[in-house]
């Protein structure tokens, strides 16, 4: 009888640990908190998830006033409709480099990407409104990240790529991120770039767009006319390289975490027709 009782106890313990494992996988909450939530709800996983969600929300409220000075920038391209760079912050560099934080950044990017595509780019016309909308849409993800990391996480800003008005047709957009860890588009420096195809019927290779964005990330601190700089890794100027690839530059945006954005916009041609006033 004693052996049977012990066997049942061991079986129950194994089953409980499996529930803890499942709950941790679904919520990413600490193991101890998962176990406590399951005990509180008498083994009801769904109710335990609600308990953890409420605790995470309460913890997030307490941590929102903490200063966030570390983090990552995220390149976000919404197809042909536009692009932006998002800055996501944490309290420590240790947290910013964690898989939890990096994956949260990726989910934030996905949320903005959907908004860009669904609105056909209209969401980016007002960066402050885009930021507010993104914060609202990702509130649950941010709260979950705060609960797991144990420190504050914020979406600091959304910087929009603005096209040159006179180079806004047949646009292709690319991105490049420097200092990435294991998650694409999340790193220390992010750049997005828009180019116009000289031949509208010709598709631009994704690798070509990446090359253009990488050049502007690499030369973001350089002074002078970007068109006369040597294109990254070549002997050609930027203007020559773009023309060689059937492209015309429209605009670029580069954000180095913690610094002011650097933008370039195609200058108006000197021989552009000026319409008389009145």
From Swiss-Prot:
**InterPro entries with a match to the protein in the record:** EF-Ts_dimer_sf, Transl_elong_EFTs/EF1B, Transl_elong_EFTs/EF1B_dimer, UBA-like_sf
Q: What does this protein do?
A: Associates with the EF-Tu.GDP complex and induces the exchange of GDP to GTP. It remains bound to the aminoacyl-tRNA.EF-Tu.GTP complex up to the GTP hydrolysis stage on the ribosome.
Name the record gives this protein:
Elongation factor Ts 2, mitochondrial
What remark does the entry add?
This protein may be expected to contain an N-terminal transit peptide but none has been predicted.
Q: What GO annotations for molecular function exist for this entry?
A: translation elongation factor activity
Pfam families named in the record: EF_TS
State the species of origin: Trypanosoma cruzi (strain CL Brener)
Q: Which family does it belong to?
A: Belongs to the EF-Ts family.
**GO annotation terms (biological process):** mitochondrial translational elongation
Has keyword Plastid? no
Q: Name one GO cellular component term.
A: mitochondrion
- State its location(s): Mitochondrion
What keywords does the record list, in alphabetical order? Elongation factor, Mitochondrion, Protein biosynthesis
């Amino acid at each position: 009888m004693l052996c049977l009782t012990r066997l049942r106890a061991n079986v129950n313990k194994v089953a409980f640990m499996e529930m803890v494992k499942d709950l941790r996988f679904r919520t990413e909450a600490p193991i101890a908190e998962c176990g406590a939530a399951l005990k509180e709800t008498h083994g009801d996983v769904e109710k335990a998830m609600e308990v953890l969600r409420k605790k995470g929300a309460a913890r997030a409220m307490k941590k929102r006033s903490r200063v966030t000075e570390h983090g990552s920038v995220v390149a976000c391209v919404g197809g042909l409709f536009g692009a932006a760079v998002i800055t996501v912050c944490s309290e420590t560099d240790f947290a910013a480099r964690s898989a939890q934080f990096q994956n949260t950044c990726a989910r934030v990017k996905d949320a903005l990407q959907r908004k860009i595509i669904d609105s056909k780019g209209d969401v980016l016309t007002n960066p402050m409104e885009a930021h507010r909308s993104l914060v609202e849409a990702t509130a649950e993800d941010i709260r979950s990240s705060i609960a797991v990391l144990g420190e504050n996480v914020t979406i600091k800003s959304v910087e929009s790529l603005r096209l040159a008005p006179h180079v806004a047709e047949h646009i292709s957009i690319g991105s490049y991120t420097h200092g990435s860890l294991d998650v694409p588009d999340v790193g220390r420096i992010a750049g997005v770039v828009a180019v116009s195809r000289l031949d509208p019927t010709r598709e631009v290779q994704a690798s070509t767009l990446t090359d253009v964005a990488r050049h502007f990330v690499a030369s973001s601190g350089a002074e002078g006319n970007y068109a006369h700089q040597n294109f990254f890794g070549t002997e050609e100027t930027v203007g020559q390289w773009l023309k060689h690839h059937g492209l015309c530059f429209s605009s670029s945006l580069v954000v180095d975490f913690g610094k002011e954005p650097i933008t370039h916009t195609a200058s108006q041609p000197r021989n552009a027709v000026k319409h008389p006033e009145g």
